[in-house]
UniProtKB/Swiss-Prot annotation:
Record carries keyword Cell membrane: no
Bilayer disposition of the protein: Multi-pass membrane protein
Keyword Transmembrane helix: yes
Pfam families per UniProt: Oxidored_q3
A single MF term (Gene Ontology): NADH dehydrogenase (ubiquinone) activity
Entry EC number(s): 7.1.1.-
Disulfide bonds: none
Transmembrane feature ranges: 9-29, 32-52, 61-81, 98-118, 144-164
Gene Ontology cellular component list: transmembrane transporter complex
Taxon lineage: Bacteria, Bacillati, Cyanobacteriota, Cyanophyceae, Nostocales
Protein name: NAD(P)H-quinone oxidoreductase chain 6
Amino acid sequence: MNLAEGVQVVSFGILATMLIGTALGVVLATSIVYSAFLLGGVFISIAGMYLLLNGDFVAAAQVLVYVGAVNVLILFAIMLVNKRQDFTPYPSAGIRKVLTAIVSVGLFALLSTMVLATPWAYSTTPKVGDGSIIVIGEHFFSDFLLPFELASVLLLMAMVGAIILARREYLPEVTPSGLPQTVLTLPERPRELVGAGSETQE
C-alpha cells in the first residue's frame, strides 16, 4: 500500500500491538476455544502486515486460507474432541520444562541473530516489475515445487484426519435380535439402532 510514512508507522504500531496482544491471548487464555478465536486475530494482524508490504495477494491468501480454513478446522477439531478430563500431572514434568526452556532460548537466540545480521535497508520507491501473483506462481512451480507439494500432502493428511475424527461408527455386521432389518434402515445412526435392539431384548 502506498501510504504516507507517518500513516505507515501508525498502522504498523497498531498491527504490531494487535499481533502481540492476540498472540499472548492464545497462550494465556484459559479456554481453548477462546485461544482458537484469538488465533484468528493473529492471522488477521499478519495479513495487515502483508498489506503494508504491498503483498495484496499474500494478505488475501492469509485471510482465506488461515482464517477461513485452518482456524475453522481447528475450532471443529476442538469442539469434536473436547472432552473434560481431570488434570493429572506427568511424572517427568520437570524434564519437559527444562527441554521447553532450552528450545525456547535456542529459538530466541536464533531469531535475535537473524534480526541483528539481516540488512534492513529498504527503498521506499517501488520496483517496476511483475505483480506479486506472477512472482509467487513462478516460484511455486520452479524453486519451491517440492515444499509446495509437501504442503499439499500435509493438508491432505489433515483433512483425512479430520474426517476420521468426525465420522460415525458403522452398523455392526450382525443385526441385533428382535430388530427388523429393512431397506429404510439408515447406517449413519447406529447408536439409536443398537439402543433399540437392547430395549427389545429386555
